[in-house]
Amino acid sequence: MDRLEVLARYDIHSIEQPIRQKQWSEMARLCSVTPLPIALDEELIGVNMKAMKEELLSVIKPQYIVLKPTLHGGMRGTEEWVALARQHGIGSWITSALEGSVGLNAVAQLTSHVYGDDIEFAQGLGTGMLYTDNMPMTTEIRGNKIWIREA
């Protein structure tokens, strides 16, 4: 908790999962008293049944969840997580799990579909430029938005 208090002084948006997964009681305690919003990440991996997602969000009550579609049930699983998070008043964002350009394009389109014009902050979709042997990107970043290139 001391570390979270120190970090909170720096106007940081949030911190991703500060303890290892499978410690729901401790994570719930931290989320209830943290001075810095906590975003669950690894905790969501392998939680694919709707009832378990509901239970996790109800018990832990995080401020945010971070979704990687390839690790969280694909497009449908991600949409379900976002819908449940909204029902619980929990923020969310989508990020890549280091997909190549084809996967990143799909994640970008999913993000646009899920959030539309209601995107509140940056999503983690800038990883496609990390590869040297990637297929050409069909998307480009202009300012703070990602666009599909015209053919």
Task: Please identify what each model-predicted range represents.
Residues 97-151:
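Flexible C-terminal active-site loop/helix
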